[in-house]
């Protein structure tokens, strides 16, 4: 793997993905400049000037600053303002690479196999925001623009509590009871936050341009995910059914593109990743 030179500036450095990128890059001995909203509030009118004063020619920039998930128009607008502030800030800076941490929500939620060549057809505000955010960032003049589109991310430290591994793990540790909608038939690919950070660091080392879908390559039903969490949870944990699962969809990822770029990458499977997360969450709760 080629050696990285220069500074890595991470926006959203205290967020779920951003903090893991900072940790992973720091472990590799890189010069990391972590920036959170406390350092530069990209939603404020003068933020582009503040960020421009920090940036230097040759910097590599990871854009992980966002309000996620975007649940309303205000969230969408704020995210686009944040990205526009970034674009304005780098107008006079020779950025070596811009990595935009986006989402697989840009593809919508229909059943099927997803690849980097799949068409973008978002069917949620979060998906529409993610795609618009990518388009705003495309205005940055850089020799390497990398769009990272992870599948649903899970891991210790997640704050979103979305339906799936993160919520199931919290439920099993708090009450010993995991709630699944209907039969839990819908299938999704879930990827660990550590794997997402690893791919981002790899993409910087090799200056990968274009779209990178990040997934485990293993799609699992929500019922099976709940069972995996139950089995590594406290004794007596159980799965209960609530309501119904309307129009379940079945999504899989072809990660051959990811494998071609990083032949030695071994994604973390759900059985291993979920056990690691539950153990880490239990340890954090008892710390």
Predicted regions, residues:
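Active-site Tyr-X1-5-Lys
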Residues: 121-146
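C-terminal substrate-binding subdomain of Rossmann-fold SDR/epimerase-dehydratase oxidoreductases
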Residues: 176, 181-184, 188-287
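NAD(P)H-binding glycine-rich loop region in Rossmannoid oxidoreductase-like domains
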Residues: 45-81
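Adenosine-cofactor binding site in Rossmann-like domains, unifying the SAM/SAH pocket
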Residues: 32-50
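Conserved Rossmann-fold NAD(P)-dependent oxidoreductase catalytic core, especially the SDR/UDP-sugar
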Residues: 85-125
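SDR active-site strand-loop-helix element
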Residues: 11, 35, 61-65, 98-104, ...
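Flexible, glycine-rich beta-alpha linker
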Residues: 107-108, 124, 148-163
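N-terminal Rossmann NAD(P)H-binding glycine-rich loop of SDR-like oxidoreductase domains
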Residues: 4-26
């Amino acid at each position: 793997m080629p050696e990285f030179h220069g500074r890595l500036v991470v926006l959203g450095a205290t967020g779920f993905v951003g903090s893991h990128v900072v940790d992973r890059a720091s472990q590799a001995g890189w010069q990391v400049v972590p920036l959170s909203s406390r350092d530069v509030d990209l939603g404020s009118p003068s933020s582009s000037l503040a960020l421009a004063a920090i940036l230097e020619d040759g910097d590599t920039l990871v854009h992980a600053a966002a309000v996620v998930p975007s649940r309303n128009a205000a969230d969408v607008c704020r995210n686009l303002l944040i990205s526009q502030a970034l674009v304005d800030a780098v107008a006079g800076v020779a950025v070596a690479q811009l990595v935009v941490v986006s989402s697989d929500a840009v593809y919508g939620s229909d059943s099927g196999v997803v690849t980097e060549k799949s068409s973008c057809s978002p069917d949620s505000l979060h998906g529409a925001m993610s795609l618009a955010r990518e388009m705003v960032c495309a205005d940055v003049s850089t020799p390497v623009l990398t769009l990272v589109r992870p599948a649903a991310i899970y891991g210790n430290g997640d704050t979103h509590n979305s339906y799936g591994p993160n919520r199931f793990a919290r439920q099993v540790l708090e009450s010993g009871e995991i709630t699944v909608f209907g039969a839990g038939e819908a299938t999704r690919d879930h990827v660990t936050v550590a794997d997402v950070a690893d791919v981002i660091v790899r993409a910087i080392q090799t200056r990968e341009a274009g779209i990178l879908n990040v997934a485990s390559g293993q799609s699992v039903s929500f019922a099976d995910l709940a069972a995996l969490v139950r089995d590594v949870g406290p004794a007596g944990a159980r799965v209960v059914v609530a309501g119904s699962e309307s129009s379940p969809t079945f999504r899989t990822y072809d990660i051959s593109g990811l494998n071609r770029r990083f032949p030695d990458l071994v994604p973390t499977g759900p059985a291993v990743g979920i056990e690691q997360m539950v153990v880490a969450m239990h340890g954090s709760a008892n710390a």
